[in-house]
């Protein structure tokens, strides 16, 4: 069984290694948590590249084909699914307290609650699982990485949680670049298939 998967990353920048130090320089949003965003859909990566280019005043769009670790039951948190018991156990062991049951029902609640807990927030559970600021998102990503979580994951379409997925990779060293392609999109941000051109960058 393969130990890796192929995913895609859309950007307006050229580089030969991923780095967490550049977080927020793409489209500037981290709605699903902090990490390096990748997707199982090439066309979605092209869309993200276009959005990043517009946000940064750039003309060029690039899609990186990357190799990443295989998604397993206990190495990720999925936004709209219950959190794996092994992940919960590792987290509770490290923080020394029990996570409330209502927080375990969905990865997005778990992530936000834990982030707020790590930054010392002392408010109602409902508030802690509802919103998390940038500091909380940063702390929770670092913490989850330390207990063996590789990904924050969410569905490409909220109506189809078992279809294409997007992920935030928590450790830059888990991403291997296989190739870089320059792409163009039309006025509706749809990939122009004939525009795809592999480029060499060192």
Model features per residue range: what roles?
Residues 43-49:
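Short amphipathic alpha-helices within nucleic acid-binding modules
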Residues 2-31, 39, 52-202:
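Active-site and NAD+-binding cores of ADP-ribose-processing enzymes
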Residues 35:
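Active-site rim elements
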């Amino acid at each position: 069984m393969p130990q890796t998967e192929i995913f895609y990353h859309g950007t307006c920048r050229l580089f030969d290694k991923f780095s967490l130090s550049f977080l927020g320089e793409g489209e500037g949003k981290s709605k699903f948590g902090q990490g390096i965003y990748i997707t199982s859909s090439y066309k979605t990566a092209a869309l993200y590249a276009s959005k990043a280019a517009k946000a940064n005043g750039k003309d060029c769009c690039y899609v990186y084909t990357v190799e990443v670790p295989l998604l397993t039951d206990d190495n990720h948190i999925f936004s709209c699914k219950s959190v794996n018991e092994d992940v919960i156990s590792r987290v509770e062991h490290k923080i020394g307290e029990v996570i409330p049951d209502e927080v375990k029902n969905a990865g997005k609640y778990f992530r936000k609650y834990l982030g707020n807990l790590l930054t010392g927030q002392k408010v109602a559970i409902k508030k802690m699982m509802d919103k998390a600021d940038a500091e909380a998102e940063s702390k929770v990503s670092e913490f989850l990485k330390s207990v063996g979580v590789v990904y924050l994951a969410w569905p490409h379409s909220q109506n189809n949680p078992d279809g294409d997925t997007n992920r935030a990779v928590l450790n830059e060293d888990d991403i291997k670049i296989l190739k870089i392609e320059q792409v163009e999109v039309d006025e509706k941000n749809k990939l122009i298939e004939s525009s795809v051109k592999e480029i060499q960058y060192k």
